[in-house]
């Protein structure tokens, strides 16, 4: 398991969170 994978998953989670906020405002 490389730390890059965990970091990637975390970034993906952050992106999903931001997208949800943006869509909620639209």
Swiss-Prot record:
It comes from Carcinus maenas. This is Hemocyanin subunit B. Hemolymph. One of its GO terms (biological process) is oxygen transport. Signal peptide: none annotated. It comes from the Eukaryota. The keyword Secreted applies. GO terms for molecular function: oxygen carrier activity. Its main location: secreted. Belongs to the tyrosinase family. Hemocyanin subfamily. The lineage of its organism: Eukaryota, Metazoa, Ecdysozoa, Arthropoda, Crustacea. Transmembrane segments: none annotated. Hemocyanins are copper-containing oxygen carriers occurring freely dissolved in the hemolymph of many mollusks and arthropods. Keywords: Copper, Oxygen transport, Secreted, Transport. It is found in: Secreted, Extracellular space.
């Amino acid at each position: 398991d490389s730390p890059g994978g965990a970091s990637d998953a975390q970034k993906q989670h952050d992106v999903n969170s931001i997208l949800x906020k943006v869509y909620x405002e639209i």
